[in-house]
């Protein structure tokens, strides 16, 4: 699963905003996405992905919200 799909999956399951650390941890715990080097997703990767998809995500008060 692509990282953006994993972020949406995690956020749909949780009603309300999440921090990038919470999202990265949930993706890792559920095994939804793994980097090419085998390491778990980082909060920086989550943040970069969210910035690439402003039509899907918004940032408010340090939390990421799903817009779709």
Predicted regions located by residue number:
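Charged low-complexity interaction tracts in eukaryotic proteins
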Residues: 1-4, 18-21, 26-68
